Amino acid sequence: MSLDPAIAAKLKRNDAGLFSAVAQEKSTGDVLMVAWMDDEALARTLETRKGTYYSRSRQQYWVKGETSGHTQYVHEVRLDCDGDSVLLIVDQEGAACHTGTHTCFDTDVLLAAEQ
């Protein structure tokens, strides 16, 4: 798969050719996770509607839920104003975080809402 050249032209990548991808749950608005993508991962996501990312540590592509069953169905993909990040609006089946929790953002609250 290759990314549409019109989309590729809008992306700003880091030195490794990557950009960040934020997965947000459609039904709740919760931010579930942040991962990395490159052009190929984005092309696969757009083609299959499955959250597909690039692992920097393993240097390979991975489809969310491929081994765990905790899949992401992608409803929308949006490019941010700077072109260096994408937002995936998803239906999350099971845990989004590799620790087994629904979101990766449930461990440490660094600043809580004022009461």
UniProtKB/Swiss-Prot annotation:
Pathway: Amino-acid biosynthesis; L-histidine biosynthesis; L-histidine from 5-phospho-alpha-D-ribose 1-diphosphate: step 3/9. Pfam families: PRA-CH. Its EC number is 3.5.4.19. Gene3D superfamilies: Phosphoribosyl-AMP cyclohydrolase. InterPro entries: PRA-CH (IPR026660), PRib_AMP_CycHydrolase_dom (IPR002496), PRib_AMP_CycHydrolase_sf (IPR038019). It catalyses: 1-(5-phospho-beta-D-ribosyl)-5'-AMP + H2O = 1-(5-phospho-beta-D-ribosyl)-5-[(5-phospho-beta-D-ribosylamino)methylideneamino]imidazole-4-carboxamide. Binds 1 Mg(2+) ion per subunit. Its cofactor is Mg(2+); Zn(2+). Keywords: Amino-acid biosynthesis, Cytoplasm, Histidine biosynthesis, Hydrolase, Magnesium, Metal-binding, Zinc. GO terms for biological process: L-histidine biosynthetic process. Mg(2+) binds at residues 80, 82, 84. It is found in: Cytoplasm. GO terms for molecular function: magnesium ion binding; phosphoribosyl-AMP cyclohydrolase activity; zinc ion binding. Zn(2+) binds at residues 81, 97, 104. GO terms for cellular component: cytoplasm. The keyword RNA-binding does not apply. It is an enzyme of class 3 (hydrolase). Belongs to the PRA-CH family. Catalyzes the hydrolysis of the adenine ring of phosphoribosyl-AMP. Homodimer. This is Phosphoribosyl-AMP cyclohydrolase. It comes from Rhodococcus erythropolis (strain PR4 / NBRC 100887).
